[in-house]
Regions:
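Beta->alpha loop/short-helix hinge microenvironment recognizer with preference
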Residues: 1-398
């Protein structure tokens, strides 16, 4: 895919300083760090190296990446690294994709209590799947799953939901056998939805009772226990959105899919159309359109575009990818070996191409743009240092 001509970094560099001044005191430290990281990514501010071709006289400078998990430019290499690490976990079984979505009324609470409510979303979604799968009426097995949190819709609005990838089966209670689910069917979504709703609302009530929720502005009145309890009443009667997508075509397709989902950010640079002092335009999918092309162009005031990007910054240290059940980090290796033995399956050896467009990664040196030869590093320089070479930046040389 060709490099985009416009980036979120351009918006931040051009209009970020004014945004920070106008919203001083209303931006938290993680948001400020993300803005700074995105602005400085692959610029001289972060240092870098000079690479020279081994066949011709071409040289170019590659500036370091910020490696921030919210940076649109830094996710390709991170996704590839993650995918390679997960290759050995693949099993020769069907894989299912289950999505848990929070209602709008809960999403509002989540926005003001990100760590607490997003954490509860992970916990209750996993508990729901583990409980229903363990029930002999459904599967009667101990399953495993990988969950990925997304907090955005296509228009960058706040829309928290959890993507859960689950192998189609699990270990028997005594661990002596593999229990496969029915072909093409995992678990009943209505049963999942009802249990998820109950577990989540119970957990949310506990968070409120123990003083772990904070409310401000339009939600300030929810600090009152009586008003908060009344607020949850209607949510107990509405249907919560839990749906299961059809199984993947192959275990390898799971990784290709996951690598696109695990390290996504609120918007990719390729979706940007234009950016001016007053307006930013970008492509988005309008799912209200039932037929034909869903893609539309949205134009937002520049301040609103930046605000929408920043509402998806996660709290420091919060893990947006989690493994549960037999895929939990502490037991995964042993459980995978046991399951492979039960299925008489060999370890996965399918190769995966680890492509990266990150020129600052010494392990992912791009070929010479002039002759296609191999590039090698001849000089490195730190933040604040000026390279001795007068070669152009990699983006201009490529």
């Amino acid at each position: 895919m060709p490099r985009p001509k416009l980036e979120v970094a351009d918006v931040f560099r051009n209009y970020g300083p004014a945004y920070r001044r106008e919203h001083a005191g209303h931006l938290n430290l993680p948001q400020l760090k993300v803005m700074s990281a995105v602005e400085n990514c692959r610029t001289a501010a972060l240092g870098g190296h000079v690479a020279a071709c081994t066949k011709c006289d071409h040289q170019h400078i590659a500036y370091n990446s910020c490696r921030n998990r919210h940076c649109p430019k830094c996710q390709g290499a991170a996704a590839q690294d993650w995918m390679l690490a997960r290759m050995e976990d693949l099993l020769p079984v069907e894989y299912f994709h289950v999505v848990f979505t929070l209602p709008a009324q809960i999403a509002d609470i989540a926005y003001q209590n990100k760590a607490a409510v997003y954490g509860l979303l992970f916990k209750t979604a996993a508990q729901t799947l583990l409980t229903i799968a363990a029930d002999p009426k459904h599967l009667g097995a101990r399953i495993g799953m990988t969950s990925v949190l997304h907090t955005w819709g296509s228009a960058m609005t706040h829309h928290p939901h959890l993507h859960v990838i689950v192998p189609g089966g699990g270990l028997s209670r005594d661990g002596s056998g593999w229990v496969a689910c029915r072909s093409g069917f995992f678990l009943p979504v209505k049963v999942l939805s009802r249990l998820f709703r109950r577990l989540f609302l119970e957990g949310l009530a506990r968070l409120h009772k123990t003083g772990k929720l904070r409310f401000f502005n339009d939600l300030s009145e929810l600090a009152d226990p009586g008003i908060f309890a009344a607020h949850l009443v209607a949510l107990r009667k509405t249907d919560w959105v839990v749906y299961a997508k059809p199984p993947f075509g192959s275990p390898e397709a799971v990784l290709a899919y996951l690598s696109r989902y695990t390290h996504r950010v609120a918007i990719s640079n390729h979706r940007l159309v234009s950016a001016e002092a007053n307006t930013v335009a970008f492509r988005w999918k309008d799912y209200r359109i039932k037929r034909g092309d869903h893609m539309r162009v949205m134009r937002l005031p520049t301040d609103e575009f930046i605000r929408r990007f920043l509402i998806h910054v996660l709290p420091s240290g919060f893990h947006r990818i989690r493994h549960t059940g037999f895929l939990a980090n502490g037991i995964r290796r042993g459980r995978i070996e046991t399951i492979r033995r039960l299925l008489d399956a060999k370890p996965n050896q399918t190769p995966v191409e680890a492509e990266s467009d990150d020129p600052s990664d010494p392990q992912q040196q791009q070929p010479c743009p002039k002759c296609g030869g191999q590039m090698r590093i001849i000089q490195t320089f730190l933040r604040g240092q000026t390279p001795k070479s007068r070669a152009p930046p990699w983006e201009d040389a490529a």
